[in-house]
Amino acid sequence: MLSMNETKRNVRPAGFEDAEDIFSLIKAYPEELLPRPISDIVQNIDRFLVCAQAGRLVGTVSWKILPEIGAPRNPSIEIQSLAVDRAYHEKGVGRELVGAVIARIRATHPAQIIALTFCKPFFERLGFHEVPKEELMHKIYAGCINCSKYDSPFTCPEIAMILDIAG
């Protein structure tokens, strides 16, 4: 029988049939991820990718377009809700998901890709670098204002990281 490392993985766009599994993956990380109601997942299913292995979903990632006021040709895109089943950590699932979402995003020519994360080394290995949150506040404000975990984006311990891809 094949092990988790030997079983073929499939990263693909999410479908409506994946919504409940996506919800469960995100819900498994209450300290690390903002909750996403299942209705939000369904409404944004076209902005989710999933990783399936051994007949089940083992990871998910989504993205959000952050338009720049007065510069519609230079939006940033935020990677959100990256969640990998704990049994599949350190097996390349997160790297595959982020790589797939970057490839998809790159085709739209955004100015940069943003991630707010507790996993700085993971994103550094993918080419991201840390920036002060103040540099991104106008872009992430809409998400941060609805956060139920922290009083202010400046008290949130997440690290702001960007991948510059314009050029």
Predicted regions and their residues:
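A short beta-loop-alpha structural element at the N-terminal edge
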Residues: 8-22
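Hydrophobic adenine-recognition pocket in adenosine-nucleotide-binding enzymes
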Residues: 14, 82-84
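Helix-loop element at the rim of GNAT/NAT acetyltransferase active sites that forms part
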Residues: 25-36
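A conserved beta-strand-loop-helix scaffold within acyl/acetyltransferase catalytic domains
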Residues: 36-47, 53, 60-76, 80-82
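Conserved GNAT acetyl-CoA-binding A-motif
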Residues: 105-118
